[in-house]
Amino acid sequence: MTIRRLDPVLIDRIAAGEVIERPAAAVKELVENALDAQASEIDVVLEGGGKTLIRVTDNGCGMSAEDLELSVERHATSKLPDGDLFAIATLGFRGEALPSIGSVSVLSLTSRMETATHGVALSVEHGRKQTVIPCGQPRGTRIEVRELFRTTPARLKFLKGDRAEARAAADAVQRLAMAHPTRRFTFTSTDTAGFDYLPCAEGPEGLLARIGAVLGKDFEANALPVEAEREGIILEGFIGLPTWHRANGLAQYLFVNGRPVRDKLLTGAVRAAYMDYLPAGRYPALALFLRCDPQEVDVNVHPAKAEVRFRDQGLVRGLLVGALKQTLQQAMHRATPDGGRVALGLLAMHSAGQGQRPVSSASMPSASRQAPTMPPRDWIKEGVQDWDWRQSPARPQNPPQNPPPGDRIEMSGSLPLGFAETPAGLNGDSGKELSEAASETPHDEPLGFARAQLHETYIVAQTRDGFVLVDQHAAHERLVYERLKQARAAQTVERQILLLPTIVELPEADVERLVDAASMLADFGLVVESFGPGALAVREIPIVLKDGSVPALIHDLANQLQEDDKALIPLERKLDHVLATFACHHSVRAGRRLGIEEMNALLREMERTPGSGQCNHGRPTYIELKLGDIERLFGRG
């Protein structure tokens, strides 16, 4: 077979397969062109998932007849005036988008510059360019793409349904809209929901408003601001609380110099920053913007410009991981406020299921409405009917600014990792404890003061404007985990030598894994060695685990190491998994009775500990209900 030259139309169609692989890619390229033209308003219309029609209209600078004719020629661009591919400040730069689209569709362009008296129009039908003609057109450019991929049926065969393609196009527009909050974006489609993002103010507030418009208003309530700079690279944006996680990574928006990217370096850094806070298979929601000198990043490494390459990848990764970890630690004990709303919703559903009308903030009766008349009862006649809920001691009065110093209970110091060993609960002398605790002022501590323990599992604490419900095991597990990490970093893990070694029987593969990890485990105070086939001898344990079950700990560690080996988890992550397993075994269990002092000590330690709003598995350690919400449940709002 002899070699022959391909005709230009076929060459363009082959090239289009790299740049325009689906309608969403065409939409992205056209919107990027509008942004490069300094448009302040961009309108996108889709029909048939973009296969029937794509129309992008903008009010940018427009094009002259000469520019319009050149715009559909391959590798003709106005965005590389000096030919430097390492100083690119625009979204587009190759001059491939329009000729690629024109080779696989019917492409119509209409444009007018502000200084021109009329507009100009040009059509390209499946690679065949027509003549430029004058026309009427407001300032800006309108581009229509029809019959996309009609002449390449193989490409059409691999496209998804109209709804899926329209959603992909909407996502492409949303990502660009998030990166340019001061501009207006409208999107209309026959196959999926549209949107109209009005311009937002410059600065963090405007950026958060645009992110909230894309991700939903709940993100604004669960967002943490991020701002950092290192050696000329600036990081800004917002990240979601760890308890506000998602089932996939679609809510992760990453930008480099205003360009949406899906870069493995950046997503890996995000995963590393959140690894102590999220359960397996869950992903954070965030929008992060990196800005740097164009010379420090190469954007010409991917046909669709979805990936970039940094000159100093270690610097970028270090900045991202460090800034995100610091932000999450500064959030301290904060957890998502959605937990309270979910609890209220469940209460409302339960009320409805019991034959009562559903309770909602919209249908709550106000305090001024007349309550239904109840049949007379003897206990009502004895004075209960005169009780005024507004005089309830549970309602905050005007407390002193600070509780007495003697009422503050510290967990650190003599009790570095746990509680007092004497069990206490809600019987026996606990009534005295509760009466004494009732005199405390709960309003000046973020998590309030303990009032009761439910089912020996949950702590009820009163705050200034409501109460919090704490999962005692989940909260203590996070506290122990953070203290173990500090001890590991300081190399101060205390050990206890066992008088007689504990022998644990295990499958030989598990014994081999634990022996291979012996040096790592020794750093945490756990000394193990092989004890013949299928057995392991434990000679030393961390002193914090002296009251725990050593065999149970060894079995859990073996299971964790097996899972890590399957997932090829790096050593650093394995160390954290070992610590998390230690913490779980040492934490106070559900079903353990706690005294008021112990409960308050836990609350104070939570307030001082970074990340205590969620346990090691990413679940919230507490939920908060506001007094106003509680009152609405009872029709008093």
Curated annotation (Swiss-Prot):
Per UniProt, the ranges with Basic and acidic residues bias are 378-389, 430-444
Entry GO terms, CC: mismatch repair complex
The annotated region (Disordered) lies at 353-444
Question: Highest taxon of the source?
Answer: Bacteria
**Pfam families xrefs:** DNA_mis_repair, HATPase_c_3, MutL_C
Q: Indicate yes or no for the key word Nucleus.
A: no
Name the keywords, alphabetized: DNA damage, DNA repair
For this chain, the annotated S-S bridges are none
The GO terms describing molecular function are: ATP binding; ATP hydrolysis activity; ATP-dependent DNA damage sensor activity; mismatched DNA binding
Report the InterPro entries cross-referenced here.
DNA_mismatch_repair_CS (IPR014762), DNA_mismatch_repair_MutL (IPR020667), DNA_mismatch_S5_2-like (IPR013507), HATPase_C_sf (IPR036890), MutL/Mlh/PMS (IPR002099), MutL/Mlh/Pms-like (IPR038973), MutL_C (IPR014790), MutL_C_dimsub (IPR042120)
Describe the function of this protein. Answer: This protein is involved in the repair of mismatches in DNA. It is required for dam-dependent methyl-directed DNA mismatch repair. May act as a 'molecular matchmaker', a protein that promotes the formation of a stable complex between two or more DNA-binding proteins in an ATP-dependent manner without itself being part of a final effector complex.
Official protein name in the record: DNA mismatch repair protein MutL
Q: Which organism is it from?
A: Beijerinckia indica subsp. indica (strain ATCC 9039 / DSM 1715 / NCIMB 8712)
The lineage, from the top, is: Bacteria, Pseudomonadati, Pseudomonadota, Alphaproteobacteria, Hyphomicrobiales
